[in-house]
Amino acid sequence: MVKQKRRLQKGAALVLSLLLLLGSLAGCGGKPQEDASGVDGPTNTYTPPVNEDGQIVITMPKTLLGGKTAEELEAEDKEQRQTAAQDGTLEQAVYDALLANEDGTFSYYLTKEQYPKLKAAYYWLGCLRDAYTTEISQEFVTAADYTDIDKNGIPWGLTVSVDAETYYSMEVWYSAVVTVAPAVMLGRYQVFCGVPGDEWAVHVTVKDADTGEVI
């Protein structure tokens, strides 16, 4: 698992900049589905304490930046917040701020009410589902199921079944879509569940939907 973790971490910066799945969490984003933690949703109940300002602070390691620097993410977030304010949609934000740290990491600042919404969004994105509808977001993916779920409800693995013909037609792209991208999203979910930033780990298995063989 450690070897797979390192491979996915190194590949994260290569792919996340081109991944459409991240669109639903771009900038301050829209509000994910309110009932995203239903029967088939996340079961982890961890909630970190609030600071003296009433904020929950979640820091993401550099291995989960998603292909950009922390400073770039902060600048983009501020720009998108200005646009949202002009459009009258800022109240839908799922966190209050995204700020770069001196060590190259970045931190989310959230209220206690916002925290479970962003946490649930990462849960769904980690298994290739739309954060709003919780439906699989890629047509060539027939199934995506979490595996290796621990006693705290934290998944450490993902099995993805794909249409092999489509997958191989653009293997470099589609391989990234079903491995690196969900690994980063699930890695962020793990951090939201209290996993230290240097201990996140995800193993992704891709299978041919017709034969069940591992690709």
Model-derived features: positions:
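C-terminal motif of bacterial Sec signal peptides marking the signal peptidase cleavage site
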Residues: 23-27
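Bacterial N-terminal signal peptides that target proteins for export
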Residues: 3-15
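Mature, Sec-exported extracytoplasmic domains of Gram-positive
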Residues: 31-215
